Structure formats: C-alpha cells, structure tokens
C-alpha cells in the first residue's frame, strides 16, 4: 500500500499562459520650449504718474534713468511681473 497522498498539479492563479504580449511603454516625454508665448502683451516700461508732482523733486524733470526694474514697473503687482518673466 502507498501511504503518500496523491500529488496533483499545482497551477498558479496569477500567471496567464497564451495571452497577448504587449511591450510596456514608459511615461510620455515632453519637450520644453525655449521661448515663452503669452496670450496678452507684456507690460511696457515706464512709471505712471511720476514727474514733477513729488515734493522736492521739481527740478529733476521726468527724463530720469531707471536704475532698478522695480522703478520701471512700480505700477504693476509682483505676480504680474512674474507672469511676464520680468522678475
């Protein structure tokens, strides 16, 4: 008499045999553009309302050299300067 239990076939439930094989694709690759394109025009340089109306600055006139970009765009908010790449 044989005391060993009969050995049955053990099949894996996770493996599918004979199914279609498709190559796996990696994540999509995006190319970054070198130039920025805006839907609206960027703001123009120039200070709005600056001139002889400041007390003590009457003799200087309005033809001043802008040293800092904040002076040229002081009429804009900080997020607007960042939107157009000025800062």
Swiss-Prot record:
The modification N-acetylmethionine is found at residue 1. This is Retinal rod rhodopsin-sensitive cGMP 3',5'-cyclic phosphodiesterase subunit gamma. It comes from Mus musculus (Mouse). Residues 26-44 have a biased composition (Basic residues). One of its GO terms (cellular component) is plasma membrane. Residues 1-12 have a biased composition (Basic and acidic residues). Residues 1-55 are annotated as: Disordered. GO terms for biological process: positive regulation of epidermal growth factor receptor signaling pathway; positive regulation of G protein-coupled receptor signaling pathway; positive regulation of MAPK cascade; visual perception. GO terms for molecular function: 3',5'-cyclic-GMP phosphodiesterase activity; cGMP binding; spectrin binding. Gene3D superfamilies: Retinal cGMP phosphodiesterase, gamma subunit. It is linked to Deficiency in GMP-PDE activity cause accumulation of cGMP in visual cells. The elevated cGMP levels are associated with degeneration of the photoreceptors and blindness. PANTHER family: RETINAL CONE RHODOPSIN-SENSITIVE CGMP 3',5'-CYCLIC PHOSPHODIESTERASE GAMMA-SUBUNIT-RELATED, RETINAL ROD RHODOPSIN-SENSITIVE CGMP 3',5'-CYCLIC PHOSPHODIESTERASE SUBUNIT GAMMA. It catalyses: 3',5'-cyclic GMP + H2O = GMP + H(+). Participates in processes of transmission and amplification of the visual signal. cGMP-PDEs are the effector molecules in G-protein-mediated phototransduction in vertebrate rods and cones. Its EC number is 3.1.4.35. InterPro entries: PDE6_gamma, PDE6_gamma_sf. Keywords: Acetylation, cGMP, Hydrolase, Sensory transduction, Vision. Pfam families: PDE6_gamma.
């Amino acid at each position: 008499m044989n005391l060993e239990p009969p050995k049955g076939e053990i099949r894996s439930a996770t493996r599918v045999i004979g199914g279609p094989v498709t190559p796996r694709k990696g994540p999509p690759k995006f190319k970054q553009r070198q130039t920025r394109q805006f839907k609206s025009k960027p703001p123009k340089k120039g200070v709005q309302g600056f001139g002889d109306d400041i007390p003590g600055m009457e003799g200087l006139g309005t033809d001043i050299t802008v040293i800092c970009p904040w002076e040229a765009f002081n009429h804009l908010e900080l997020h607007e300067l960042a939107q157009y790449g000025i800062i």
